[in-house]
A protein has these predicted regions:
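Alpha-helical transmembrane segments of polytopic membrane proteins
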Residues: 63-64, 103, 127-135, 183-198, ...
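Aromatic-anchored segments of alpha-helical transmembrane domains
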Residues: 74-79, 161-174, 232-237
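Internal/C-terminal transmembrane anchor helices
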Residues: 218-244
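Transmembrane-helix motifs of polytopic, lipid-linked glycan transferases
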Residues: 135-153, 167-170
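Hydrophobic alpha-helical transmembrane segments
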Residues: 121, 125-143
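Membrane-interface coil-to-helix junctions
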Residues: 79-120, 124, 128-129
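Soluble catalytic regions of membrane-associated enzymes that act on cell-envelope
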Residues: 243-417, 425, 430-456
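Juxtamembrane "helix-exit" motif on the non-cytosolic side of transmembrane helices
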Residues: 82-89, 169-182
Length: 563
């Protein structure tokens, strides 16, 4: 009995202890609500795959962002960086539905392929439209490449390496991209690359469908591929602006000249770091068209870099500008011949047809002009040009209202000589060697003599200007002071020379003395202070041994001289 009572007491004590513990562990009513809310929040958070982090996107959104940014980057490149290049390339071809006008192209290997791609190339007549097309093609290429090679979601956009490689090829070709080569390769190569990547992507999709493989669950990703695409395209753009500055200007200036935007040509040429001959030539044309030739002619450096041009007919670098320079010098027949030579040697080009049409118009050859206008009108989107100059053909008085054509008329030669009587190129040799001309021609002739460093011929023209009471720009005064170093009587013959100009020449010679044995050091160390003066040009620039000649020693028809 005693044992039973003891057991019952122990059991009762244990029961009370457990109940006390349960009572102590029971939550307060308010505490219970708070804990329940926390549990619900924890349960809700448990459905999230990962904590929210900066830069993570859903795969679909990341894909659109990546390829959208890539598209915009490529579009910006072909609009704002290489827009003038693709526009000039479009003008450097010819396309029509008339088989007889396309025989030159169709008879070549792959001619029919080039014929088809030239129709697509017409989109590049307007840089934004051509840029949009190229950006679309290149973006689709990048998408197909990423899919075909199973690029991870976070790196999608690395496929823009293919378009960037195409753009790098364009940069490496420079002016050769369209000059005397097939310009439609600009659109043909991207289209071929798209077709190749699309075929690979289709094969991968077919294999994937046959194997019935299931894709893993889509997780949020960081679109590193978008950053890579922007860096690649941006790096290409910076390279183009730095390395291919002259390539861009060589394409841009003829486009601006067609619109008669001379002031833009002048301002951009003066900003160029090291202009080529082509850039300097269009700069001179713009100065001449705005009556500023002798005032600003030497404001740019004339240390011409060597161009890497494909060799075809021997007129590689000069073929870029000699046609337009002859035209704007009033030499219509040499300009016409240069355009014709380009067509014969390199096939039909619409820009050459346009120049020949204008030469025929100004020469009064109406039938010939109509022939070229008809050829131009067969090419799509050129009707505005044809309509404008057809009106002048029917009413010659309209020519006088055109600033460019009336300016060219004012420079017509007044002496009858064959082109072979002058040094080449014609526009330079004619102005150095002419014996008579108008007052406007006298100015261009004086400028040509200064450029050629032919001081004897220059002094003859300066004497005529003195007799006519014409003002002497600063460069002419400096040139006379330079000539006076060997011919002191020159200063006495020209009272127009300011009294401080000879002092400026002597100051230049003092600065030049330490570098007289090193032509490159002479040029670089004196450039900051003296660029823009004739002394700097005469002693430091355009003085490569292969480019110089002694005053008045070149024989007629030779190619000697500074050019």
């Amino acid at each position: 009995m005693a044992l039973r009572a003891c057991t019952e007491n122990e059991s009762t004590h244990t029961h009370h202890t457990v109940n006390k513990q349960r009572k102590n562990s029971a939550p307060h009513p308010l505490q219970g609500k708070k804990t329940g809310a926390a549990s619900a929040q924890a349960a809700k958070g448990g459905h999230q795959s990962a904590p929210r982090r900066f830069g993570r996107m859903k795969p679909v959104k990341a894909k659109w962002v990546t390829y959208g940014l890539g598209f915009l980057a490529v579009f910006a490149f072909f609009t704002f960086v290489y827009g003038d290049v693709i526009e000039r390339a479009e003008q450097s071809m010819y396309i029509s539905t008339a088989p007889e006008t396309m025989q030159y192209l169709l008879s070549q290997p792959h001619g029919h392929l080039f014929y088809a791609s030239r129709w697509v190339m017409l989109l590049c007549k307007w840089a934004p439209l051509g840029a949009a097309f190229l950006a679309l093609v290149m973006t689709l290429t990048a998408r197909a490449f990423d899919y075909a090679f199973r690029i991870p979601r976070s790196l999608r956009g690395i496929g823009f390496a293919v378009p960037v490689a195409e753009m790098a090829w364009m940069l490496s070709r420079g002016t050769n991209l369209y000059y005397k080569n097939e310009p439609s390769l600009i659109v043909l190569i991207p289209l071929v690359a798209l077709a190749a990547c699309a075929v690979l992507a289709a094969l991968v999709a077919l294999v994937k469908r046959c194997t019935k493989s299931t894709a893993p669950a889509a997780l949020a990703v960081r679109p590193w591929g978008a950053l890579l695409a922007l860096l690649m395209v941006g790096g290409t753009a910076v390279t183009a602006l730095k390395v291919n500055e002259n390539v861009i200007l060589t394409a841009r200036f003829p486009n601006l000249a067609d619109r008669q935007d001379w002031e833009t040509i002048i301002s951009e040429a003066q900003k160029a770091k090291r202009p080529t001959r082509a850039v300097a030539a269009y700069y001179a044309i713009a100065l001449e068209e705005t009556d500023q030739l002798l005032n600003h002619m030497f404001d740019i450096p004339y240390d011409f870099p060597k161009l890497q041009l494909d060799h075809f007919d021997g007129s590689e670098e000069y073929g870029l500008f000699v046609m337009d320079c002859n035209f704007h010098a009033g030499l219509l027949n040499p300009a016409y011949r240069a355009a014709m030579d380009h067509v014969v040697m390199n096939g039909p080009r619409v820009f050459a047809y346009k120049r020949m049409a204008l030469c025929a118009l100004l020469n009064g050859e109406k039938a010939l002009c109509r022939k070229y206008l008809d050829l131009i009108d067969r090419m799509p989107f050129e009707h505005d040009f044809v309509e404008r100059y057809s009106a002048m053909l029917d009413n010659p008085k309209l020519i006088d209202s055109d600033a460019e054509l009336s300016h060219v008329r004012s420079l017509y030669p007044k002496e009858s000589k064959f082109e072979q009587n002058y040094q080449q190129p014609s526009f330079l040799g004619y102005n150095v060697g002419l014996a008579q001309g108008s007052d406007r021609t006298l100015l261009t002739s004086a400028a040509a003599c200064l450029y050629s460093k032919d001081m004897n011929a220059f002094l003859v023209r300066a004497q005529i200007m003195h007799q006519k009471g014409m003002p002497f720009p600063t460069c002419m005064q400096e040139a006379i002071a330079v000539a006076a170093l060997k011919m002191p009587q020159a200063l006495e013959a020209f009272p127009e020379v300011g009294k401080f100009v000879p002092d400026e020449v002597r100051a230049f010679l003092i600065d030049a003395k330490p570098y007289v044995e090193d032509r490159e050091a002479l040029r670089q160390n004196l450039k900051e202070r003296w660029l823009g003066t004739y002394m700097y040009y005469y002693y430091t620039e355009n003085n490569d041994p292969s480019q110089t000649r002694k005053d008045s020693e070149a024989t007629p028809g030779s190619k000697a001289g500074v050019n």
